[in-house]
């Protein structure tokens, strides 16, 4: 893998943060760091302090856990992209890693962790044992930060052979003697891909003076058409994207998505939008999905629509995506239905980028980091706060989609809400953290 040379001011900054007790996660983290460095990133390879294992375990892996500097919340602030690597314990992240994540709360409260791109890796004793749950748990923290989450590369044949986990890399515990070259190569590729996406994250200098391009960002808003409340929120989401100069397609998934041509809503109101098709997703740079929540899950017609898309790489691959919901009660799917949609989006290769807490509108509407939500128990139509939140979600979809796309069209006019520090300030910070990755000094 050849290195990509960049000016230091434009090099993406990647932090690979790991917890390892048997060496498996350490080896994957080193490989991910090598991959990111080869893509021109400045890399920090950092460990989480382990104060949990018993004496025998301490002796076993004390050596491997002292060769890299200890991660701090400031490393999350420094990074444009993060690889989070933890073993699976009881279907969740390890306790030391969870303590590290919790330690970022003060920076999160100041709005300093938004708009990073995050991916994750894990390992377990057996083929299942909670690997998926661990990766998804890590991503919930990332969404609270306001990050974009990058799952597995569904176009990489090596990933399919290594774990076939759409949420990230998950492997079996292995001793150094049993190390799988395929696992290591896949981790290296995941680090390289993370660096490529980290290079597209916003910094003040590039958002304040965008370069001219050929045309506006494209946003498709797809909603379940049965209920007026969902339709109104979809219209507001589309309006938010248009405010930033995006081209928008507002599309519906009728109740009974497999009916040819689709059935129109039977409720009163303006005419329904055109039926959604695969081409509407292929056209878009970003997609927002809206649905009723039924029994804590997204409505079956929307799930049906998504499940008819090609498995693996398809029209959502590498595109920004998020969702909003309407629920019967405040806690009858306002989070679980959104997370379920996110899980579906990973299977399509999307970059899942919900609002998080990147704008006051999210707090005013109830503080749901996973997407906008309205409970029908609060009124038949969305509240002003819910409308403002979903309008902002449309704006955010346009901006993130604009940053992620590879084609040259005009960027949206307004930056993502949230504070990003001057990237030049951190370049001289803690120079003792320099590590050597793949024969190159990276910090």
Q: Which sequence ranges carry the predicted segments?
A:
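Mobile beta-alpha loop/short-helix "lid" or hinge segments that flank ligand
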Residues: 48-53, 146-175, 253-258, 349-378
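Short, glycine-/small-residue-rich phosphate/pyrophosphate-handling segment
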Residues: 114-162, 320-365
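Gly/Ser/Thr-rich helix-start
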Residues: 24, 86, 92, 130-131, ...
